[in-house]
Amino acid sequence: MIVTTTAHIEGREIASYLDIVSAESVHGINVVRDLFAGMRDFFGGRSQTLERALKEARIQATNEIKERARQCNADAVVGVDFEISMPAGRGGMVVVFATGTAVRLK
């Protein structure tokens, strides 16, 4: 399954646009457990805890849009867009939304 952020796939022609596919992935970040590591990461300029949660959420959302595209008998998903949200008051949660268009290729 080809998944791309571009509207086209080089060297391939889109035969039909099947459906919009989307997925959400929510991951919790254990802020208390990672407090000291988080402080070190923060002062170093990066939070490995947050980066790890974002990466896992993005991978999960990508896998879900692939599965939804397979259910449409698609060959690829084009125009994939990721949005990231960290809901206020939710105690260290990361939400990744993935959206794209399932297509059949010639």
From Swiss-Prot:
Residue spans crossing the bilayer: none
Family stated for the protein in its record: Belongs to the UPF0145 family.
InterPro entries (alphabetical): UPF0145_dom_sf, UPF0145_YbjQ-like
Organism, scientific name: Pseudomonas fluorescens (strain ATCC BAA-477 / NRRL B-23932 / Pf-5)
Protein name in the entry: UPF0145 protein PFL_3418
Stored Pfam families: YbjQ_1 (PF01906)
Top-rank taxon: Bacteria
SUPFAM superfamilies reported for this sequence: YbjQ-like (SSF117782)
